[in-house]
């Protein structure tokens, strides 16, 4: 890299959007135009960065968050596509090959490993590693080993290096699905990246979540690989120990995107000390180098250099560019450029890739295995993923079986006469509609980051995964579909022939797969789930309306008729109808006109079958005539349609694969701080004045920091007064066991200890030792077999324990739409007793904001990573949320320094120390404590493998007590400048490859220290229990506040999340607005003929069907709040779970009422029906108010009874299909089996539909079109009116030509109420139905 600079669009400071921006759209547009120039403002991401990393070298990249370390690695790896408006200048080459050419032809050799651990959670560790190894399996292997031997050898190699052998059969998991520990998941990520076999690795904070010993082993493993294989490694490490630092050859230091040093690791410290900065005692070199870039960092300045050393990023950069070290670097780069043989490098790469590529791989492809092998491997992985998540498949299959029984029995043995024709069409349409609804459940975005990572690793084409997912999921979908069609087909009494059955089976399968692929194609085009659900909702409407069941081809308007031809369901429905009705003779039954009293002996030529497709004088209707007249269908098109569906299926699959392959990730301009609406200008002015002051007084600030650093660290600030704990927490012989495939697995083994007020206890151990498990067990957050005693002041814990303790989780989970201050205020109000005045709570919140130094971003929205708070700010918020609850018993913290740089980690631990000195009791797990961090703790609990205690006791001054314990029990002597934490972990054999002879858990059990601790615990229990027996149960309430108080504040929080989630609100608005227009203009001017009555029915039916995609939207949004509550808020007993559901419901209502009003206007009036207020207002009341009240509640009820969102989508499809089946639209109640008529009465959709249709049809005169009239001849000498007069005394309809003596034209309906009666509805039921609803 030579003089590389990167610029991107400056989105670092944004103002959050709200729904108010839409309500005030004109002003929003004007404001947007005014700020257009600022939106295009560029910011420096990297400036003038140079580096020479030779083969076999390791380069450490240091800098604070926001310094540009990640951007530096991405630039080096060629992963700059996510830089919005990014402009890269300078020169980047790889042994002489320019970066552009490298990315085109040799990309697999450059690997970027991101900080986040994204994996398929339901795959095991073994399956995850095997897949990565298989994708990079060379065609020519050493000693001609088999593929299986190659995979096994490599898997065991990586597992041994990173200590993953014992986790092979454990799921990888994620934040919401249990699996391996966070540290083990990071090791899986590292092993997977190494399996990608790059020659240049860019590791972004790869040691995050690893304990010190494993982090060191990682560094040494990379060191070994660079030495043996000649690879190059660029690594960012936020908390690097001295041992880790010494494994690197070179180091570069970044400060606000500027490079301030690049050279050998042995020279960096001298460079900055010569500059004037001194390294404090026992501070590692990496900490020292990072601290220099922090104005508030822990560093000292040589006497006399206070006003000479650089302070700002620009000053540091200028010093570096003028230094002899920089000149030497430039010289080395120029020399290497002249020495490198580019052509030889290309030849080597080409030869290597040629030997590795398997047969069938394209010559220009940079993937190792062929495209077909990629599909095979991804398909196998797909089967394993589905098998690992059995609940979805089980729910899907059970739903299909249940739906088949219900629908089949609903249409049980449909009449073979004309009376059953509509039912037979309905059951076929419904089967297609059900699997269309199921297709909505396949819209998912959770795996997109994994595909992007694997694309970076060059494991496989993203399109290969798209094709493989289709293949792997097909058999599992077929299980449910097969049961569905068998049960439905025979219960409904469809055409009993093998040919017809298998034709139906084939057509339903083909259509189901095509529609599923269509929805997956839609999702591959979209950036967000809300966006995909909105588009899918409109597609769903198209599928339902233009299948030709609801509105037939002759009735379609030309502006939308084309839609019918581009959807597979239209062709499937035609072919299924042909298979069912071809050659069928349908007896007219009760549809002969005239008939009844007085017409018993009438001749056949004087009657007609009042049914579509009838012929004069014929008492039956041929199925082919019916299809031709009603739908314009021809039997000869049956297998033509099958071919067309094949084309649709292949087309959708191919398009999805193409979109997946070339879809770019969402671009960004780096971390963006998003502030609350209306606060941007004030905050910008504050920041501007602050920055100016810092620049003018930088040297004074640095000198102040020197004085602070040298002051007494144990001084207690008055800010922390009132934070003291009031109880002693004791745990004795705590064990935790979970079920395992091999029996019971013990994760904790007789762990004992205690926390007293005023102490800071460290919980340390290697990754997977059980640190988080112990923390969760003590905090009452684990589910399993727990034995032992956990006592508060010597007594068993009561219901108030959870709310009296604070728990800072490793994952920083917060409500994205709230500001930092609002998040803290909500926690304070929910966690502290209601008796405390609100003003006092808010004052305390301000105090915590000041303590944690969050004033600068207190009005910023939490947002998401990259578009909201950064990692450090999120961690501070996580701690603050617990502190404002003022836990009076204990504060648990799980890895509070994970993901932070050394300076941020130092600030967090120092703050914890001050809390402890103020009287707080703290138990904290920590992975990579430096010497300076470790010595801030008072007491240590050390866990070994299997959750066994190795040490519990005082750490001592300069860690003397704990060091003395290990040295006297056989460990080597600890060096004076050695990190005690690393020494301890090394002594006990922590790490993947380490081993020791001593049995440290056994040594502890037999030690004098263990006896003393046990005795002390017993004495404490005895003394405390005797002094606390007089306490009352006033604290034992589960919640700190009343239900009504919780309701008020949870409702307020929920309303803010809706108001500020513009993407969700806009998606909802677009769905209802576009759907309204779509329905309105599909059934535009329904007319007064008979088909207009049917169209009116289906227009109302489709208005109800809108609830399906709208329900998916509601559930997708509610899932975010539900998961946050389950993972964090419920564990602290903040508020009752029911309030989450109730407040979400109440906040959905106003938006649905507004948007359903838009839907009403855009759909009702285009129909050309009654516009007087007496009808339209009641229609509005029924649909835009009552119906919205109903299905919002239904959506939330289903979600809260489901294990996850995907399962909820399946259940929604099942329940809505159930409700729509029995509402009377596709099967009139008169044709339902007697058993199911209760369900017709029980379904709320029945009454909604009856009201909507009744308002449209009551007193509406009907005038049949010419083709709707049925013709017959009266007896000789009689007119049509005279002949049919007795019939109309009890029959419906009218004669269009009563004075004619031949060709009597009969219309089936005279007024809309007659059609209502046929579907068992009546306008008179209107207010009765309102009561039922």
Swiss-Prot record:
Membrane topology, from the record: Multi-pass membrane protein
Top-rank taxon, per record: Eukaryota
Domain spans labelled ABC transporter: 30-281, 729-971
Gene3D superfamilies associated with the record: P-loop containing nucleotide triphosphate hydrolases
Claim: DNA-binding is one of the keywords in the record: no
Glycosylation sites: 48, 144, 205, 350, 697, 733, 958, 1320
Gene Ontology BP term (one): cellular response to xenobiotic stimulus
Compartments it resides in: Membrane
Annotated SUPFAM superfamilies: P-loop containing nucleoside triphosphate hydrolases
InterPro entries hit by this protein: AAA+_ATPase (IPR003593), ABC2_TM (IPR013525), ABC_transporter-like_ATP-bd (IPR003439), ABC_transporter-like_CS (IPR017871), ABCG_dom (IPR043926), ABCG_PDR_1 (IPR034001), ABCG_PDR_2 (IPR034003), P-loop_NTPase (IPR027417)
Cellular-component GO terms for this entry: cytosol; mitochondrion; plasma membrane
Residues annotated as transmembrane: 13-33, 392-412, 425-445, 474-494, 499-519, 534-554, 642-662, 1071-1091, 1092-1112, 1150-1170, 1178-1198, 1210-1230, 1235-1255
SMART domains listed in its UniProt record: AAA
GO molecular function, one term: ATP hydrolysis activity
Pfam families: ABC2_membrane, ABC2_membrane_7, ABC_tran, PDR_CDR
Coarse class of the protein's main subcellular location: membrane
Binding site for ATP: 765-772
Record's keyword terms, sorted: ATP-binding, Glycoprotein, Membrane, Nucleotide-binding, Repeat, Transmembrane, Transmembrane helix, Transport
Family statement drawn from the similarity comment of this UniProt entry: Belongs to the ABC transporter superfamily. ABCG family. PDR (TC 3.A.1.205) subfamily.
UniProt-recorded name of the protein: ABC transporter ATP-binding protein/permease PDR18
Species annotation: Saccharomyces cerevisiae (strain ATCC 204508 / S288c) (Baker's yeast)
């Amino acid at each position: 890299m030579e003089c590389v600079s990167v610029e991107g669009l400056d989105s670092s400071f944004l103002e959050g959007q709200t729904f108010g921006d839409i309500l005030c759209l004109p002003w929003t547009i004007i404001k947007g135009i005014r700020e257009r120039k600022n939106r295009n403002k560029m910011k420096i991401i990297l400036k003038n960065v140079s580096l020479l990393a030779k083969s076999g070298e390791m380069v450490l990249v240091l800098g604070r968050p926001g310094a540009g370390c990640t951007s530096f690695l991405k630039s080096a790896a060629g992963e700059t596509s996510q830089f919005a408006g990014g402009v890269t200048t300078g020169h980047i080459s790889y042994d002489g090959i320019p970066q552009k050419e490298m990315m085109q032809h040799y990309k697999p050799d450059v690997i970027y490993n991101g900080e986040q651990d994204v994996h398929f959670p339901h795959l095991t560790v073994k399956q995850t590693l095997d897949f990565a190894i298989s994708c990079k399996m060379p065609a020519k292997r050493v000693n001609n080993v088999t593929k299986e031997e190659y995979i096994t050898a490599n898997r065991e190699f990586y597992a041994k290096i990173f200590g993953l052998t014992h986790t092979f059969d454990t799921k990888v998991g994620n934040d919401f699905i249990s699996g391996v520990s966070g540290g083990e998941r990071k090791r899986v990520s590292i092993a997977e990246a190494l399996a990608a076999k790059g020659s240049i690795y860019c590791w972004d904070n790869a040691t995050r979540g690893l304990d010190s010993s494993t982090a060191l082993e990682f560094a040494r493993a990379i060191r070994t690989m660079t030495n043996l294989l000649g690879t190059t490694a660029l690594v960012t490490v936020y908390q690097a120990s001295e041992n880790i630092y010494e494994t690197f050859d070179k180091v570069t230091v970044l400060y606000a995107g500027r490079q301030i040093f690049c050279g050998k690791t042995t020279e960096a410290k001298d460079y900055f000390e010569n500059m004037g900065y001194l390294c404090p005692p026992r501070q590692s070199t990496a900490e020292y180098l990072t601290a220099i870039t922090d104005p508030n960092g822990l560093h000292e300045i040589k006497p006399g250099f206070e006003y000479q050393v650089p302070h700002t990023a620009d000053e540091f950069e200028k010093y570096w560019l003028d230094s002899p070290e920089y000149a030497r670097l430039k010289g080395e780069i120029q020399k290497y450029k002249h020495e490198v043989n580019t052509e030889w490098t290309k030849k080597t790469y080409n030869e290597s890739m040629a030997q590795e590529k398997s047969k069938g791989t394209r010559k220009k492809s940079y993937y190792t295995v062929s495209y077909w092998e990629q599909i095979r491997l991804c398909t196998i992985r797909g089967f394993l993923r589905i098998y690992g998540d059995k609940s979805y498949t089980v729910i899907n299959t059970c739903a299909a079986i249940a739906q088949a029984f219900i629908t089949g029995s609903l249409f049980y043995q449909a009449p073979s006469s004309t009376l059953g024709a509509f039912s037979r069409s309905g059951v076929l349409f419904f089967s297609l509609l059900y699997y269309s609804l199921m297709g909505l459940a396949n819209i998912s975005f959770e795996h997109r980051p994994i595909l992007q990572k694997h694309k970076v690793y060059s494991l496989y084409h993203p399109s290969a995964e798209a094709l493989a997912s289709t293949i792997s999921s097909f058999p599992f979908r077929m299980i449910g579909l097969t049961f569905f069609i068998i049960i439905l087909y025979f219960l409904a009494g469809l055409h009993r022939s093998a040919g017809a059955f298998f034709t139906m089976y084939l057509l339903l399968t083909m259509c189901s797969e095509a529609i599923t692929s269509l929805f997956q194609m839609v999702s591959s085009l979209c950036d967000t789930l809300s966006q995909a659900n909105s588009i899918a909702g409109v597609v769903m409407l198209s599928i339902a309306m233009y299948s030709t069941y609801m509105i037939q081809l002759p009735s379609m308007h030309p502006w939308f008729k084309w839609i019918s031809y581009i959807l597979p369901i239209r062709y499937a429905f035609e072919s299924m109808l042909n298979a069912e009705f071809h050659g069928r003779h349908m007896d007219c039954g009760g549809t002969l006109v005239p008939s009844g009293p007085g017409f018993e002996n009438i001749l056949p030529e004087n009657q007609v079958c009042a049914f579509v497709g009838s012929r004069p004088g014929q008492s039956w209707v041929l199925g082919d005539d019916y299809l031709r007249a009603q739908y314009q269908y021809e039997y000869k098109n049956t297998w033509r349609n099958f071919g067309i569906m094949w084309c649709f299926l292949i087309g959708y699959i191919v398009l999805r694969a193409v979109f997946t392959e070339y879809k770019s990730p969402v671009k960004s301009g780096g971390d963006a701080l998003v502030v609350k609406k209306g606060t941007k200008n004030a905050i910008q002015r504050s920041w501007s004045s602050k920055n100016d002051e810092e620049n003018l007084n930088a040297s004074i600030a640095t000198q102040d920091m020197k004085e602070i650093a040298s002051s007494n660290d144990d001084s207690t600030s008055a800010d922390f007064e009132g934070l003291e704990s009031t109880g002693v927490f004791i745990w004795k012989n705590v064990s935790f066991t979970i079920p395992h495939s091999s029996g019971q697995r013990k994760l904790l083994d007789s762990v004992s200890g205690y926390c007293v007020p005023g102490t800071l206890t460290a919980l340390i151990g290697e990754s997977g030792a059980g640190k988080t498990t112990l923390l969760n067990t003590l905090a009452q957050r684990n589910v399993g077999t727990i034995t032992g005693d956990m006592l508060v002041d010597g007594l068993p814990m009561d219901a108030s324990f959870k709310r009296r303790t604070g728990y800072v989780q490793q994952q920083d989970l917060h409500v994205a739409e709230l500001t930092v201050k609002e998040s803290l205020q909500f926690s304070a109000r929910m966690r502290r007793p209601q008796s405390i005045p609100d003003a006092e709570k808010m004052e305390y919140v301000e105090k915590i904001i000041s303590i944690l130094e969050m004033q600068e971003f207190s009005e910023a929205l939490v947002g998401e990573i990259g578009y909201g708070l950064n990692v450090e700010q999120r961690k501070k918020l996580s701690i603050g949320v617990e502190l404002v609850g003022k836990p009076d018993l204990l504060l648990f913290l799980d890895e509070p320094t994970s993901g932070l740089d050394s300076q941020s980690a130092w600030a967090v631990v120092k703050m914890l120390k001050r809390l402890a000195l103020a009287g707080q009791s703290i138990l904290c797990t920590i992975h990579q404590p430096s010497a300076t961090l470790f010595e801030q703790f008072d007491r240590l609990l050390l866990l070994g493998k299997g959750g066994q205690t190795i040490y519990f006791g005082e750490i001592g001054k300069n860690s003397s007590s704990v060091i003395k314990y290990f040295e006297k029990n056989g460990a080597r002597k600890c060096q004076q400048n050695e990190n005690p934490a690393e020494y301890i972990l090394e002594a006990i054999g922590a790490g993947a490859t380490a081993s020791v002879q001593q049995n440290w858990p056994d040594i502890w059990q037999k030690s004098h220290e263990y006896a003393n601790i046990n005795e002390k615990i017993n004495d404490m229990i005895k003394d405390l229990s005797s002094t606390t027996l007089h306490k009352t149960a006033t604290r034992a309430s589960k919640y700190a506040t009343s239900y009504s108080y919780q309701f008020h504040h949870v409702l307020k929080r929920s309303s803010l999340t809706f108001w500020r989630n513009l993407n969700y609100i806009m998606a909802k608005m677009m769905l209802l607005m576009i759907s309204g227009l779509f329905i309105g203009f599909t059934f535009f001017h329904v007319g007064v003929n008979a088909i207009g009555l049917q169209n009116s029915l289906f227009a109302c039916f489709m208005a109800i069907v809108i609830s399906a995609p709208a329900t998916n939207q509601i559930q997708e949004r509610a899932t975010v709040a539900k998961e946050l509550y389950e993972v964090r808020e419920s564990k602290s007993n903040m508020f009752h779970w029911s309030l989450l559901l109730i407040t979400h419901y109440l906040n959905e209502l106003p938006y649905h009422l507004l948007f359903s009003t838009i839907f009403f206007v855009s759909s009702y009036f285009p129909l050309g029906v009654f516009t007087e207020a007496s009808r339209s207002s009641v229609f509005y009341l029924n649909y835009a108010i009552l119906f919205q009240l109903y299905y919002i509640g239904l959506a939330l009820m289903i979600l809260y009874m489901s294990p996850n969102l995907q399962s909820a989508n399946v259940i929604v499809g099942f329940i809505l299909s159930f409700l729509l089946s029995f509402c009377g639209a596709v099967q009139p109640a008169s044709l339902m089996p007697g058993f199911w008529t209760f369900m017709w009465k029980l379904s709320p959709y029945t009454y909604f539909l009856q009201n909507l249709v009744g308002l449209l049809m009551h007193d509406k005169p009907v005038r049949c079109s010419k083709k709707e009239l049925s013709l017959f001849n009266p007896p000789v000498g009689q007119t049509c009116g005279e002949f049919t007069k007795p019939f109309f005394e009890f029959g419906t309809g009218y004669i269009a030509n009563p004075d004619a003596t031949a060709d009597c034209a009969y219309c089936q309906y005279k007024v809309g109420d007659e059609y209502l009666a046929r579907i068992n509805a009546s306008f008179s039921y209107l207010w009765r139905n309102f009561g039922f609803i």
